[in-house]
Each structure stands twice: as C-alpha cells, then as structure tokens.
C-alpha cells in the first residue's frame, strides 16, 4: 500500500513531537518500542546506534543489514571492520570519538531501499540523536543516507568531495562530508582511494 503524502507528513510530525523532549536513553527506548511502520514486523532488533557520548563525529549509514539486525548493533561484520579501520586511519575510534547510527533503525526486507513512510518514521529519531550528541561533524556513508540527510536527489558522485551543511532544529549548522558505504567499498576496492580523500576532508573540515 502506498501512503498519501499528507499521511506521511502527519506521521513524521507526531513522531517528532514524541522524540523532542527525550534524552538518549528515552530515545533509545522509543526506537526499540516503535511500531510506526511495517518494518517493525520483521525485525529482530531495532538498531539505535552506539559509540561515544558526546561524540566528536557522528557516522550515519543507511539501514541495518542481516548481521546488524541479529546483533542489534550498527556496522558489524566485514563492513564494520572496514569502517573501524577507516576511522582509525584518521585517529578516530567508535568507542572514544564517534557515535554510529543509521537513517533507518530496522532492517528493510532483503535490504531493499526504504519506503517514504519508513523514512518519515525514522527521521525524527535521527534528528534527535544529532541534536543530543551535538557532533562537530557528520560523516554520511552511502547514497541513500546522504540523499535523506541532505534532502537532495543528487548522486553520491556529485555530493562527495566537498563539505555540506546540515541545519539542525536548534539552529546549529553542522559540517557534513559524504562518502561511500563500506559495503560498496568491499565490492569496489578501487574506490577506497576516494574514500580516503573523503576522510581527510572530514578530518580537516
């Protein structure tokens, strides 16, 4: 079933109101209990995120995969190991410096792209995470995550290589750098050199 645009806007507004006054612990509970879209029906775990609090960097991926859904943690398995190595190459670690989250908190079936109503259900949680963590900068990994966070349809090739700005609900401007998702880099290792350039840009930013 395709949701009407008006219904999606109402859903997003209602969830944003619920998330607005929550601290991180309360927000995590809201995510774990969320039944706002159909993704809740097939999940093992809602993946809230993990890492440093407060965080110098926030890393935002797309959605949990099979391993993340099973363990309830973001970026595990081969993609997680590559992400950790990427962060360590610029002196960062997920335990000390970085909080890692996804745009979508529950795994879409077959790792398909999320539907508009699923994005509407999860976006208020991510925006509240950003507000509470107040990172110095955000590293966004993957086309879908970048397009969602920056509200654009531009390709990742057009988005990477420069610093963007995210305006928070509190009026702050946070630098955003876009790069490739680690899963893509595992399939296309020739792009790792460009991902390294993106990391250096984020570290300078």
Language-model regions, residue ranges each:
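A polyanion-binding, active-site-adjacent surface
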Residues: 1-205
């Amino acid at each position: 079933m395709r949701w009407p645009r008006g219904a999606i806007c109402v859903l997003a507004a209602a969830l944003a109101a619920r998330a607005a006054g929550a601290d991180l612990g309360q927000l995590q509970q809201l995510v774990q209990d969320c039944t706002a879209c159909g993704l809740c029906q097939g999940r093992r775990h809602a993946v809230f995120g993990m890492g440093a609090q407060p965080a110098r960097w926030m890393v935002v991926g797309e959605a949990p995969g099979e391993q993340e859904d099973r363990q309830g943690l973001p970026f595990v398995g081969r993609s997680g190991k590559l992400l950790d190595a990427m962060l360590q190459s610029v002196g960062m670690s997920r335990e000390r410096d970085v909080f890692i989250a996804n745009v979508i908190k529950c795994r879409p079936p077959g790792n398909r792209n999320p539907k508009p109503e699923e994005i509407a259900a999860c976006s208020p949680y991510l925006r509240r995470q950003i507000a509470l963590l107040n990172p110095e900068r955000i590293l966004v990994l993957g086309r879908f995550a970048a397009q969602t966070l920056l509200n654009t349809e531009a390709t990742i090739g057009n988005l990477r290589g420069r610093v963007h700005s995210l305006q928070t609900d509190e009026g702050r401007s946070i630098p955003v750098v876009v790069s490739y998702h680690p899963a893509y880099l595992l399939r296309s290792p020739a792009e790792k050199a460009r991902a390294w350039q993106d990391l250096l840009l984020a570290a300078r930013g």
